[in-house]
Amino acid sequence: FTTVERARHLTVGLTAIDPTGTVLFDSVTACLAAQMFEDGGMDTDAPRRVAAQLAAISRHPANFVCVCDGIFTGGEAYDPWTAAYVGGLAHICRTLAAEFDVVCEMTMGLPHLWKGALPRA
């Protein structure tokens, strides 16, 4: 396998991806934080940009797996910056779920299938 580390300009990494292969993107959560809060400010366009870049990448390899922490499901009252981040993360996950064939949530090692079917091993 090959490791490609990028926090910004994600589609530049496409040149390193085998179109017949599988990409594991870990993690959407860290990628959004890196793009949204660089230089001490808040880039409110980051969620849209990250979602678009990941959707574009997902069309390149045969299989694309994204890891995202579901911190937006907690129902807590957050400060404005955290609320913007959590909302942005939810936007990315909804965008990717609409794009992907399979959406699976793992909880305590157990899969919960939201969309599609798990591939046979």
Predicted regions and their residues:
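Conserved nucleotide-sensing/catalytic segment adjacent to the nucleotide-binding pocket
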Residues: F1-Q35, D43-T44
